[in-house]
UniProtKB/Swiss-Prot annotation:
It comes from Homo sapiens (Human). Pfam families: tRNA_int_endo. NCBIfam families: endA. The gene is TSEN34. GO terms for cellular component: nucleolus; nucleoplasm; tRNA-intron endonuclease complex. The lineage of its organism: Eukaryota, Metazoa, Chordata, Craniata, Vertebrata. SUPFAM superfamilies: tRNA-intron endonuclease catalytic domain-like. PANTHER family: TRNA-SPLICING ENDONUCLEASE SUBUNIT SEN34, TRNA-SPLICING ENDONUCLEASE SUBUNIT SEN34-RELATED. The keyword Nucleus applies. Its EC number is 4.6.1.16. tRNA splicing endonuclease is a heterotetramer composed of TSEN2, TSEN15, TSEN34/LENG5 and TSEN54. tRNA splicing endonuclease complex also contains proteins of the pre-mRNA 3'-end processing machinery such as CLP1, CPSF1, CPSF4 and CSTF2. This is tRNA-splicing endonuclease subunit Sen34. Belongs to the leukocyte receptor cluster (LRC) present on 19q13.4. Constitutes one of the two catalytic subunit of the tRNA-splicing endonuclease complex, a complex responsible for identification and cleavage of the splice sites in pre-tRNA. It cleaves pre-tRNA at the 5'- and 3'-splice sites to release the intron. The products are an intron and two tRNA half-molecules bearing 2',3'-cyclic phosphate and 5'-OH termini. There are no conserved sequences at the splice sites, but the intron is invariably located at the same site in the gene, placing the splice sites an invariant distance from the constant structural features of the tRNA body.
Amino acid sequence: MLVVEVANGRSLVWGAEAVQALRERLGVGGRTVGALPRGPRQNSRLGLPLLLMPEEARLLAEIGAVTLVSAPRPDSRHHSLALTSFKRQQEESFQEQSALAAEARETRRQELLEKITEGQAAKKQKLEQASGASSSQEAGSSQAAKEDETSDGQASGEQEEAGPSSSQAGPSNGVAPLPRSALLVQLATARPRPVKARPLDWRVQSKDWPHAGRPAHELRYSIYRDLWERGFFLSAAGKFGGDFLVYPGDPLRFHAHYIAQCWAPEDTIPLQDLVAAGRLGTSVRKTLLLCSPQPDGKVVYTSLQWASLQ
């Protein structure tokens, strides 16, 4: 059972698996409203949580696909405990990262020492080959080899002297400690500690669910459910002057075909609004869909296009 947190009339889904299940199995897309963990200072691409329209949340609750719960409020009495737990986890993470950084630096140092040793051996072998090539250069080559061996011996002696001193300097084995400014902080995309949440009844009006019983919500929901049962995907259409955008399939694959406007059967539609909505829909290559539920439960649809703009 998927969980949807509701607070002040906003229904949020926090789990990535739940978002995927809603889109693939139930045809409910919602819209992401959260900042990306790696790009918190931009809003061109958003991430979790997923915000559901009230009609989407109610539909999912009615068919038993999700459980609506009231989002837990922070308790000031537990604030100090939560802060202590957070600091402890941060310190444990710092110690773990410090150990991993020291291990990585030590591995790199060993790799460099191996390369230095290989280079010294190759240089010595080259000098030995050059010394046996001609007897006329034997004296000079042997003298150069002695000088190189002397310098290499001095360098290795210095390294041997530096080795014990660095190992005795501290537990870091000569590796600089990781500064706290380099600490990687994990940005949680879900609640790290479980909390108790009480179920929310969408049939009863409350602070978290103020939509129950409102005529506008009941009108929109009846039309939303009818279109959803016909296999359409729906999303909000505020910027297109409608109630819903109607897609023939997943919005990631299709453009919207209709701009749905919800009207009660007894409502009168001003001619100016009707013309404006028709012109707007045609200009964005969509058809205006006038939707009105009937007393028998059926929904009547009327499509409208502005022919002069086609």
